[in-house]
Every structure is written in C-alpha cells, then in structure tokens.
C-alpha cells in the first residue's frame, strides 16, 4: 500500500511538472545557462552514422544475409572443392549475425531507456546523454563488423590464390560498408580487396608502400604513441584499411619503431632532462666498453 502511494505521488508530481506553463521556459533557461552541446552532439551523431553506414540507420542491418546471398549467387559457395572454406565462411557469417543482433538489442534497450527518461524530463532531453554513447557503441560494433569482413576477405583471397578461375565477388551488401574515413564506396571496397583496383603492369616495380597506406599507418602510430605496435586484430583492421598484407603492416611498424618512434622518444627525453640524459648515456656506453 505504501509503495502504491509513493508511485501515485511520483506520477502526480510528474504530471504537474509536465503540465506546468513554466516548464518549457525553465527548460530553455537551463539550456542557455548549462549548454553541453546537445544540438552539436545530435548533429555529430547523425553525420557519423551516415558516414559509417550510408543508406542504413544501424550497422549490420541485414549485412550478413546480403553477403551470404552474394556469395551464393556468385557461385563461390557451391564449388565442390570448397567445403573447408564453406565452413569457415559460415562461422564468420554466423559471428557477423551475432554482432548485428547484439547491436540491434543494444539499440532497442537504449530506445527504451530514452523513452522512459523523456517521459519525465521532456522530449529530446536525453540526446545530450545518449548521443556520445551511441557514437562510441556504433564505432565499436562497426569495428567488429570490419574485422569480420576482413577475415572473410582473407579466406576468399587464400582460395583465389589456389584457384585462379574463381568468380570475382562484387557484393552490393558489402558496398554499403564504409571504413570510417568518408572515402567513396569504390575506394573502400578496393581497400577491402572485394573489388579489384587498376591493374599494375607486371614489369613496373613498386618503390615502397603507397603514400595513402603509409599515412594511415602513421596516423595510427601517433594515436597509439605509448603502445606503438598493433595487436593481431588491429593488424587485420589496418590491413583492410590500407590494402596491405598483414605482414607488410607488421614490418612497417617494426621499422617505424626503430626509425621514427625511438628517435622521437630520445629527443623528448633530451628536451626534458637535457645534459643529465647525455651524461647517463655516456656512462652506460663507457660501462659497456669496459
């Protein structure tokens, strides 16, 4: 009985606040005094989702079924010698479907929380709090999707190396997958390896890595300056973003740590500690020589 009375009083108070003619004016006044970027968060969130998933409100919206349909229609899944790869692709598609379902579940739960919150605080009042959370989770789930797509492409590449007559896969479902940098669909698919780019003449050697690929790797290095070497999953994502192989990515970071990262660290220490560092290094050198 006491619990019912408390709920009734809360409901009455909520109704009184929402019906008050001063509620809107107070809300506007509070927004002017305490502006934490609600409109900017909403705009940024909408732009982010449109860039990540053009034409789709959420990541993974039936993407696994689209990929499976394209693989089947291309004849890739029906090749008789393709049994082991078929099993791997099936597992990856199942994992991708789970990511889709989990994100759909997250969005539904978030919508329920938003609805409950806005019943009390007013329509649109939750955007400030949920916008950044939705951005973060969209990026997380999008990264998982991208890693799974990269694995699918890796399996396909290995099979194509041993079976050169395999039909090429051009997926309309995959064409909707963006790589967080706002580039065109064509360049995104080329980085994933799902569409062949311009063919390079066999007699023309490659002098170093492409500048665009190096720029992506260098940006990652500076973003993770304290831990400048990617793990296995991060290598796969970087490989898909740059169009390089996993070994090329690994070798670049090994060289970059020696040629770029280590000299920068030493320079930073010199600027911070000055002559004391040089003296310490000189003593260590003398100790080693002795």
UniProtKB/Swiss-Prot annotation:
<dbReference type="InterPro" id="IPR009057">
    <property type="entry name" value="Homeodomain-like_sf"/>
</dbReference>
<feature type="region of interest" description="SR/KY domain">
    <location>
        <begin position="20"/>
        <end position="36"/>
    </location>
</feature>
<keyword id="KW-0238">DNA-binding</keyword>
<dbReference type="GO" id="GO:0003677">
    <property type="term" value="F:DNA binding"/>
</dbReference>
<dbReference type="InterPro" id="IPR008422">
    <property type="entry name" value="KN_HD"/>
</dbReference>
<feature type="DNA-binding region" description="Homeobox">
    <location>
        <begin position="202"/>
        <end position="264"/>
    </location>
</feature>
<dbReference type="InterPro" id="IPR006563">
    <property type="entry name" value="POX_dom"/>
</dbReference>
<dbReference type="Pfam" id="PF05920">
    <property type="entry name" value="Homeobox_KN"/>
</dbReference>
<dbReference type="Pfam" id="PF07526">
    <property type="entry name" value="POX"/>
</dbReference>
<protein>
    <recommendedName>
        <fullName>BEL1-like homeodomain protein 11</fullName>
    </recommendedName>
</protein>
<feature type="region of interest" description="BELL domain">
    <location>
        <begin position="81"/>
        <end position="152"/>
    </location>
</feature>
<keyword id="KW-0371">Homeobox</keyword>
<dbReference type="InterPro" id="IPR050224">
    <property type="entry name" value="TALE_homeobox"/>
</dbReference>
<dbReference type="GO" id="GO:0005634">
    <property type="term" value="C:nucleus"/>
</dbReference>
<comment type="subunit">
    <text>May form heterodimeric complexes with TALE/KNOX proteins.</text>
</comment>
<comment type="similarity">
    <text>Belongs to the TALE/BELL homeobox family.</text>
</comment>
<keyword id="KW-0805">Transcription regulation</keyword>
<keyword id="KW-0539">Nucleus</keyword>
<keyword id="KW-0804">Transcription</keyword>
<dbReference type="GO" id="GO:0003700">
    <property type="term" value="F:DNA-binding transcription factor activity"/>
</dbReference>
<dbReference type="InterPro" id="IPR001356">
    <property type="entry name" value="HD"/>
</dbReference>
């Amino acid at each position: 009985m006491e619990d019912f009375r408390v709920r009734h009083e809360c409901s009455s108070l909520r109704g009184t606040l929402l019906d008050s003619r001063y509620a809107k004016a107070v809300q506007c006044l509070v927004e002017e005094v305490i502006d934490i970027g609600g409109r900017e968060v909403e705009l940024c969130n909408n732009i982010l989702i449109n860039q990540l998933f053009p034409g789709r409100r959420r990541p993974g919206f039936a993407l696994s079924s689209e990929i499976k349909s394209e693989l089947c229609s291309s004849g890739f899944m029906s090749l008789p010698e393709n049994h082991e790869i078929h099993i791997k692709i099936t597992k990856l598609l199942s994992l991708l479907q789970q990511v889709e379902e989990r994100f759909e579940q997250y969005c539904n739960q978030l919508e329920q929380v938003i609805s409950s919150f806005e019943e009390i605080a007013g329509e649109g009042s939750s955007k400030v709090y949920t916008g950044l959370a939705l951005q973060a989770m969209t990026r997380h789930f999008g990264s998982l999707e991208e890693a799974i797509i990269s694995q699918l492409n890796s399996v396909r590449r290995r099979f194509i190396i041993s079976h050169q007559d395999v039909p090429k896969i051009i997926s309309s479902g995959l064409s909707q997958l963006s790589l967080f940098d706002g580039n065109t669909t064509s360049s995104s698919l080329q980085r994933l390896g799902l569409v062949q780019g311009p063919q390079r003449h066999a007699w023309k050697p490659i002098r170093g890595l492409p500048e665009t690929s190096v720029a992506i790797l260098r940006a990652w290095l500076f973003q993770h300056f304290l831990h400048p070497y990617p793990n296995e999953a991060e290598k796969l994502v970087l490989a898909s973003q740059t169009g390089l192989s996993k070994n090329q990515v690994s070798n670049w970071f090994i060289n970059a740590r020696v040629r770029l990262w280590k000299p920068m660290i030493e320079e930073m220490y010199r600027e911070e500690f000055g002559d004391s560092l040089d003296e310490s290094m000189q003593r260590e050198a003398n100790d080693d020589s002795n």
